[in-house]
Amino acid sequence: HIDWKEYAKIYEPDQDSFLFLDALEKEISFIQQVQPSLLLEIGPGSGIISTFLSRLIRTSNSVATIAIDINMDACLVTRRTYQQNGTPYTDVVRSNLLSGMASRLQNKVDMIVFNPPYVPTESEETFLPSIESAYAGGVRGREVIDRLLPDISSILRTGGVFYLLLERENNP
């Protein structure tokens, strides 16, 4: 459903996306035990990860999905991915990480997934509302990750889970 021209504006699912999907699929028994009713994907790009999870989780319960991306094109493509895959109970928000959302989500999110921009780049690139923001991780590829991490514990409910894809250069 995504036109090849749109991939010039959003993060095209790549090896890291498919690795993340494989890892999440292996976790599905645990994820179903968590019984997430609110799934948050930060930086969805095309929306394939939250669409995939919603379908897997839906077998055991209904799940509402919120996707947040700084890139408006990614928001539009994610919404279309949800619609074309019949992903129910979704909302797509254009925002820089959790700006303006953290207080409303406090202690409400059951599951967070984030395939962050982790490529080491100049710091300024991490704030661009365009395709560059999809890979620009700043110094050591950690700046975007480090801006988000302080908010995670406040938005996760007790027993909630956070899945974050990292790579060696990020010094996890």
Give a label for each model feature.
Residues 1-31:
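Class I SAM-dependent transferase core
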Residues 5-6, 92, 126, 130:
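Residue-level signal for pocket-adjacent positions within structured domains
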Residues 9, 42, 137, 141:
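Glycine- and other small-residue-rich loops at beta-strand/loop junctions that grip anionic moieties
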Residues 9, 15, 20-22, 142-172:
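Conserved Class I SAM-dependent methyltransferase catalytic core
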Residues 17, 74, 137-141:
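Glycine-centered small-residue hotspots that permit tight backbone geometry or close packing
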Residues 21-125:
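Conserved SAM/SAH cofactor-binding pocket of Class I
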Residues 68, 138, 165:
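Active-site-adjacent beta-strand anchor residues
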Residues 116-144:
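Mobile active-site "lid"/loop adjacent to the S-adenosyl-L-methionine
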